[in-house]
Amino acid sequence: MRHLIVLPLVLLTSSYKLFAQSFTFADTANFWLNELKAATKANQSLWNKDLYSPILLVNPVDRKVYANEPDSAGILKKQGPIFYGSLPTSVNISNTALEWSGKRWAMVMLPMPEEKANRLNLLTHELFHRAQPELGFVAYNPNNPHLDTRDGRIYLRMELEALKNAIAATDMKRRLQHVRHALIYRLERFQKFPGSDTTENQLELNEGICEFNGLLMSGRSDAEIREHLTARIDQFALSPSFVRSFAYETTPVYGWLLSSIDRGWNQRINASTDLTQFFIKAFGLQIDRPTIDQEAWQATPLYNGEEISRQETERETARQLLLNQYKKQFVESVHLQLPLINMNMSFDYTKMVVLEPYGTVYPVIRITDKWGTLEASKGVLISNKWDSATVSLPLQTAGNKISGDGWTLELNPGYTIEKDDVSNKFTVKPFLHP
């Protein structure tokens, strides 16, 4: 079974010196876990369930792990109030939910955010990932390549600008007008990119609802939530890729705004809910599809549409140059192709680049599979069918370790690299004894 693990990579700082003494950090971790336990208990009415459950706090530098429960295999040993051990190298480290050592866990990378609200937001986001199957949700992970195009990004940014105005509005009539405009820009996007309504909805039902849960369990006041969401939208506009990251921004805003007039709305949704239509109905809006083009155009000056269009046109020029570079690197030049069989991967979801019709380039990624472990910092092309990973030409080989420009591969026993002179590429294959 293939497992997709997504994460924004965390910049590790000298703060890890604080964690040098494991006993001291065990007390710190226990403090965070007690904070978390109190927050989930106080908010159990959100889903009629206390989400506190097995969780791993992992140091990606040395793979040390701190947990609130023992694992079934006895890898984690009790150390004061918590459990402590080392995570095997076969397990990719990220913010996610996973099955490991006999249990289903939430996993969160260290270091923790310094502010309590941000810390609880992150931890409860991942606890919701762990609880998704129990709550009737599915961890959909579709890409949304249209959100890497000029028009797709413009419509999404216009939607978010309208939502930002809705956050700031104190008058309910004005707030609903901005929400209406946001949903109109969304419907315009769906109309321009057929099928995007399905793929966007799937990611919002996964990451979007997780982030909504984190927001409401963060302990922020309404004023702090307004400030937090507004800052997030402004920061998101600078993100290099919207393909997988948009749902972290859209769904929490709609969800928080709706909670002010319909608390408990989230208990009426499931894995098959069309969130766009749900929001239109829940907000009491009437949107006439034949007139949305005109309404979207008329509302554009309210949301800085001209400047957004200018910025995205400029970005598109730079994107085309990057796509040409990636096409030469991964398609036209000699390269190494690895089959994806039973893959686990961790990557930075804010930097993905869609390279149609070949797949998606992940600039920073770690992949484990039957053949071994691949780590790359200058890009890996994952095919659209999720059946292969491509890196640039192999340059050095030392035993089972192979490397190229910006990547290293450690092969497991029984696998080797062969060159195919016909297709002008190298491939990883099982080693066949004569």
List each model region and its residues.
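Active-site-proximal alpha-helical
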Residues: 194-224, 233-290
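Active-site recognition of the HExxH zinc-binding catalytic motif
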Residues: 121-134
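Bacterial Sec-dependent N-terminal signal peptides
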Residues: 1-24
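Non-catalytic terminal regions of proteins
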Residues: 270-434
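N-terminal mature-domain "stem" immediately C-terminal to a signal peptide or N-terminal signal-anchor/transmembrane
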Residues: 21-79, 210
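Catalytic zinc-binding patch centered on the HExxH motif and its immediate surroundings
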Residues: 83-102
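Short pre-active-site segment immediately N-terminal to the catalytic Zn-binding motif
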Residues: 108-123
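Post-HExxH zinc-binding segment in Zn-dependent metallohydrolases
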Residues: 134-190, 196, 200-226
